[in-house]
Amino acid sequence: MRDFLTEEQVKTLKITHRSLRHKKLADRIKAVLMLHFGFTYSQISQALILDEVTLRRYLENFQEKGVDGLL
């Protein structure tokens, strides 16, 4: 999966990520951004130490509710 976010969505995610102090919430945003930039679920799973089912749920939540679905 690659290039599925608009520039505005990437900007919003990055701004939100910088403002978060809670690691789990930040990881959710990182996961969505990494998918957008072409990382595979497997690569993200290894990097963030999360299982692929969880990553897919994060993406689904984002697609349904936007940034609020990740928080």
Residue ranges and their predicted role:
Residues 1-71:
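Short, basic alpha-helical/linker "hinge" immediately adjacent to a nucleic-acid-recognition surface
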